[in-house]
Amino acid sequence: METNYSVIFMTIINFCILVAILKHFFWDKIKGIINERQDFVDEQLLKVDEDSEKARMYLLENQRILQTAKEEGKKITESQKEKANKVYDEIVEDANEEAKSLLERAKTDIQREKEKAEYEIKKQAVDLAIELSIKALEENIDESKHRELISNFITKVGM
């Protein structure tokens, strides 16, 4: 196969003419489109960087707010816990005072009932002694009868 230099030369000249025509009519438009696209991509990258920075700032702010809310929640919880403990202590103290009061009233009631019972026993003893004296005065009592009356008296008194 033989190389035809004239065909190669003409092809190169045709190519150069084609490039010159394309450059003259289309190169500026293509370059403008490429530059617009590059500018758009650069703007988008800047916007992404700005949005990323804003998102990071919002994240930090939200973390700070969340931490503050946690601390406030903890303070509120502690405050309510302290109030509950105070109420509990007051309730226990009131219950203890009420129990002491009931105990004192019970002791007073017991003492009163004891005194009442002692009074009744003394009254019965006096009544029995009077009754015994009346019987002794009504009858002539011999010693065995006297012992029997005393024994009955002791039995009734409960000694």
UniProtKB/Swiss-Prot annotation:
InterPro entries assigned to the protein according to its UniProt record, in alphabetical order: ATP_synth_B-like_membr_sf, ATP_synth_b/b'su_bac/chlpt, ATP_synth_F0_bsu_bac, ATP_synthase_B_chain
CC terms in the record's Gene Ontology section: plasma membrane; proton-transporting ATP synthase complex
Spans through the membrane: 7-27
Membrane topology according to the record: Single-pass membrane protein
Keywords: ATP synthesis, Cell membrane, CF(0), Hydrogen ion transport, Ion transport, Membrane, Transmembrane, Transmembrane helix, Transport
CDD domains in alphabetical order: ATP-synt_Fo_b (cd06503)
Subcellular location: Cell membrane
GO MF annotations in UniProt: proton-transporting ATP synthase activity, rotational mechanism; proton-transporting ATPase activity, rotational mechanism
Assembly mode: F-type ATPases have 2 components, F(1) - the catalytic core - and F(0) - the membrane proton channel. F(1) has five subunits: alpha(3), beta(3), gamma(1), delta(1), epsilon(1). F(0) has three main subunits: a(1), b(2) and c(10-14). The alpha and beta chains form an alternating ring which encloses part of the gamma chain. F(1) is attached to F(0) by a central stalk formed by the gamma and epsilon chains, while a peripheral stalk is formed by the delta and b chains.
Family designation: Belongs to the ATPase B chain family.
Function according to Swiss-Prot or TrEMBL: F(1)F(0) ATP synthase produces ATP from ADP in the presence of a proton or sodium gradient. F-type ATPases consist of two structural domains, F(1) containing the extramembraneous catalytic core and F(0) containing the membrane proton channel, linked together by a central stalk and a peripheral stalk. During catalysis, ATP synthesis in the catalytic domain of F(1) is coupled via a rotary mechanism of the central stalk subunits to proton translocation.
Protein's name according to its UniProt entry: ATP synthase subunit b
